[in-house]
Regions:
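Conserved GNAT-fold acetyl-CoA-binding loop/helix
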Residues: 31-52
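Acyl-donor (CoA/ACP) binding surface of acyl/acetyltransferases
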Residues: 1-18, 23-32, 65, 69-180
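Bulky hydrophobic/aromatic packing residues
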Residues: 29, 37, 59-60, 165
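A short helix-loop-beta-strand connector motif used in the catalytic cores of GNAT acetyltransferases and
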Residues: 39-40, 52-67
Length: 180
């Protein structure tokens, strides 16, 4: 695989229809490892409202929402969020991502996560980023490990997925810069 098969950028209002299509197309796949989304999540209007809110969140340093685009044609194939932003002495956040199942296994998610981590460290000056993944989703754990995250432990009964509380593997990456 050659370098740079995908790129990330902040989501824009014009992305609502394409994001909705990605979520609809992958609903069954995403629901295996994610909290159940309300029906409205799969509407263009809801995605548009999320994008509008994401701009305010970014300005107020609360959350950063990106889309993952295939470099060849610019098509949106996924999304990545930096959320649960904590400043002050912690300077950390949590990363979450989803990628169209048709593009899994090609290294695209790892590449996109690396790009967002670089931005988070260099531009946003985070000290630490945490990622969590279901032990039933070894592919997601591998994404984080390949992006430089290290395992820290298991968060017991952490997230309710499909009506059942599940454990999650906790991984983190530390900014190597001393200038934070």
């Amino acid at each position: 695989m050659s370098e740079q098969q995908v790129y990330v950028r902040f989501s824009e209002e014009a992305d609502a229809a394409e994001l909705t299509a990605v979520y609809k197309r992958n609903r069954e796949f995403f629901d295996k490892f994610s909290p159940i989304s309300l029906e409205e999540h799969y509407t263009e209007e809801h995605q548009l409202q999320k994008i509008i809110k994401s701009k305010a969140d970014r300005i107020e340093d609360r959350k950063y929402s990106f889309v993952v685009c295939h470099k060849e044609d610019g098509r949106i194939i996924g999304s990545i969020d930096l959320s649960f932003v904590v400043r002050g002495p912690l300077q950390n956040c949590m990363i979450g991502y989803s990628l169209d199942q048709a593009y899994n296994g090609k290294g695209y998610t790892t590449e996109a996560v690396k790009q967002v981590v670089r931005y988070a460290f260099e531009e946003l000056k985070f000290h630490r980023i945490v990622g969590e993944a279901s032990p039933r989703n070894p592919g997601s754990i591998r994404v984080l490990e390949k992006a430089g995250f290290h395992k820290e432990g298991i968060s017991r009964s952490n997230v309710k997925i499909n009506g059942k509380w599940e454990d999650h593997q906790v991984l983190a990456i530390i900014n190597p810069s001393e200038d934070i």
